[in-house]
């Protein structure tokens, strides 16, 4: 491994430790399959908004995903940060980072290990850390639809703002993700992912998410996406809704070789 690759992975590791979005589940597979022809990729998305007068508010968000591909392995690093204020009061403060290593075994099969940290002060999540591993089965076609299925397990450590105790549990990890190229516009595609993560010792404690994303490629490096997401937590913290619906849209610029 060259010193450039080593530096890239070191930077990802440092950011992972430092970053510590209370989305209990975060879909990263759309980023994993981005730009399949590239061995290295770094994509950044920035969003700044604000208003003054009757409505005084400011918001900023930064997202990045990075890939390092080899013949038998792939590294993925994804992170985001968002903060918002309204009338001089903080209304959002999220941080998230995910690092994943995939070893390919042939026939579309592979093994993966991953680590993740996240926080969201306004959804009472002081910190959530997890470390896990699993098996994946990739049924993607070179120029057609993509299908990926995975099963695994991870250890989760969660600390809520409202509780002194830290919760440590083992969770199962089951997911499926699909990508379908569309002819509606140049380079457009529709992505869908679904995850289910039950507590192994108490299946009544269940987390799940479904994400749909429509992507239009404006140039080789610039794209715009529209995302809808629904997540469910059977045992949310006190004062937090069990169900949550999110939507977002914005441009993304990609550096690749």
PLM ranges: what are they?
Residues 46-50, 77-83, 113-117, 133, ...:
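Transmembrane beta-barrel strands of outer-membrane/channel proteins
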Residues 50-59, 86-92, 119-127, 163, ...:
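Solvent-exposed loop/turn segments connecting transmembrane beta-strands
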Residues 243-257:
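Outer-membrane beta-barrel "beta-signal"
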């Amino acid at each position: 491994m060259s010193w450039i690759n080593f530096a890239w992975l070191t930077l990802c590791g440092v950011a992972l430790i430092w970053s510590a979005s209370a989305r209990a589940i975060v879909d990263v597979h759309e980023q994993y399959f981005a730009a399949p022809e590239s061995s290295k990729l770094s994509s950044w998305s920035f969003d700044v908004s604000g208003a003054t007068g009757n409505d005084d508010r400011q918001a900023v968000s930064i997202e990045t995903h990075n890939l390092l591909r080899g013949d038998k392995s792939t590294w993925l690093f994804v992170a985001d940060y968002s903060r918002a204020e309204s009338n001089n009061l903080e209304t959002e403060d999220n941080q998230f980072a995910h690092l994943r290593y995939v070893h390919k075994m042939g026939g579309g099969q592979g093994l993966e290990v991953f680590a993740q940290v996240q926080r969201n002060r306004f959804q009472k999540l002081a910190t959530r850390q997890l470390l896990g591993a699993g098996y994946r089965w990739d049924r993607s076609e070179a120029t057609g639809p993509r299908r990926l299925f995975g099963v695994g397990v991870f250890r989760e450590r969660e600390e809520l703002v409202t509780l002194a105790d830290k919760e440590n549990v083992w969770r199962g990890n089951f997911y499926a993700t699909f990508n379908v190229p569309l002819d509606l516009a140049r380079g457009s595609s529709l992505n869908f992912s679904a995850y289910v993560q039950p507590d192994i010792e108490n299946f009544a404690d269940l987390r799940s998410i479904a994400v749909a994303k429509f992507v239009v490629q404006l140039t080789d490096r610039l794209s715009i996406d529209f995302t809808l997401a629904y997540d469910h937590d059977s045992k949310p913290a006190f004062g937090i809704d069990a169900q949550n619906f999110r939507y977002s849209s914005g441009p993304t610029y990609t550096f690749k070789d």
